[in-house]
Every structure is written in structure tokens, then in C-alpha cells.
A protein has these predicted regions:
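N-terminal pre-domain segments of enzymes
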Residues: 22-48
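Bacterial Sec-dependent N-terminal signal peptides
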Residues: 1-27
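Aromatic-lined, polymer-binding surfaces characteristic
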Residues: 37, 44, 48-53, 58-66, ...
């Protein structure tokens, strides 16, 4: 159920933002300096915000996102499974869960402006960045974790020092 909600949220949010003009490569230095850069721009984010209250499905998805972000506030950061299970190198499930957490927490912060979501996302990012590695032998573990960190860093914008 979580995955389908997340996928639905993405498709809905970004379907409202796609126009021919937005498909052009952005070359303006000013636009590239603003956050977010990954998956949507600040202008596209504003268009989504403008639709709140006018689209019941979007409002429902936003409520689901905020509820899940609230739940994640109480969830401890994930541990590196290689510390507890000998002879395992796989952290793919941890990497995928980290993408899920970053999307939820960082988007909740962007849509609500509530610092607690950004603070929790920052703790999560620092925690996974302190893993000894992200299992470089298995490229997908690294790719998923890199995606999580990139989205978190970008969507939290100027939150970091």
C-alpha cells in the first residue's frame, strides 16, 4: 500500500506540472541555483501548492503524505544490517527504505515548511552517510542510497549549513 501511494503521489504531482515549456532544458543560472532541482522546480512546486483546496485527490494524497511523514518522525534511523548479520553484504532493502523516507520527509518539509520534518531527514541522511560503505560490489545498493541522499539534499535546499 505504501508503494502505490507514493507512486500515485508522484504521478499526480508531476502530471500537473508538465507542459511543453517545462520540457525544455533549463539553462538559466538563476533557475539552476534554486532548490529543488531534482524531479521538479520551485515554480512547479508552487503550481502544485496553488492546486491545494481545488483538487480533492491531491488534497487526499497530501494528507496521506503528511500522515506518513508524521509516522516516520518516531521511527529510528535504519541500522546497517551488516553489523548484525555475518556474511551479508546486501543493504538494498535499507537503501530502498531510505529513498522512501527521504521522499516522504523532504516533501512534507517542502509542502508544510515544518522544521521537524527537515530535522528528521537530516538525521537520516547523516546516519546513512556514516555507514562504512553502501555495498559498492552491488551497484543497485549504491544507486538507491545515492538517490535517497541526492533527493534529501536537494529537496531540503538551504536547510544544510
Amino acid at each position: 500500500m505504501r508503494l502505490i501511494n507514493l507512486v500515485g503521489l508522484f504521478f499526480l504531482l508531476f502530471s500537473f506540472t508538465m507542459t511543453g515549456r517545462n520540457l525544455l532544458v533549463r539553462q538559466s543560472g538563476k533557475e539552476l541555483r534554486q532548490h529543488p532541482r531534482l524531479l521538479f522546480s520551485k515554480q512547479e512546486e508552487q503550481r502544485i501548492r496553488d492546486l491545494f483546496g481545488t483538487e480533492p485527490l491531491l488534497d487526499s494524497l497530501r494528507a496521506s503524505l503528511m500522515k506518513e511523514a508524521e509516522r516516520l518522525l518516531a521511527v529510528p534511523p535504519q541500522e546497517d544490517p551488516r553489523r548484525k548479520i555475518k556474511n551479508t553484504k546486501d543493504i538494498l532493502s535499507v537503501s530502498r527504505e531510505q529513498v522512501y523516507r527521504m521522499v516522504n520527509l523532504a516533501l512534507a518539509y517542502r509542502l508544510s515548511g515544518e522544521r521537524r520534518f527537515a530535522e528528521k531527514a537530516e538525521k537520516e541522511l547523516v546516519h546513512v552517510c556514516n555507514f562504512s560503505d553502501w555495498d559498492p560490489i552491488h551497484y543497485l545498493d549504491v544507486a538507491e542510497m545515492t538517490t535517497a541522499v541526492a533527493i534529501g539534499y536537494d529537496w531540503l535546499g538551504g536547510w544544510f549549513g
